[in-house]
Curated annotation (Swiss-Prot):
It comes from the Bacteria. InterPro entries: BH2638-like_sf (IPR023324), UPF0223 (IPR007920). It comes from Streptococcus gordonii (strain Challis / ATCC 35105 / BCRC 15272 / CH1 / DL1 / V288). NCBIfam families: PRK04387.1. Signal peptide: none annotated. This is UPF0223 protein SGO_1052. It holds the Pfam family UPF0223.
Amino acid sequence: MNKNYSYPLDLSWSTEELASVLSFLNDVEKAYESKVSAQQLLGSYAVFKEVVPSKAEEKRIGREFESVSGYSLYRAVQAAKNTEKGMISLGK
């Protein structure tokens, strides 16, 4: 997939909020490109949900991110929830 894409970010977020969202999106990328700890991904998802508590907003960000990267936030989080412990890798 093209590595030159823009992240779906809200410019009204604080620097700390932007860092939290980017951390989660980076963990999703790791799940597809190599592997990531399920606990790490779930932890960054919990912090992401503090910044983006709305399900509708989460889905919008997920759709935008998947359209530019090919990586699904939903599938990554579900894989982490199903694994709970250990590493997840969604790459083909």
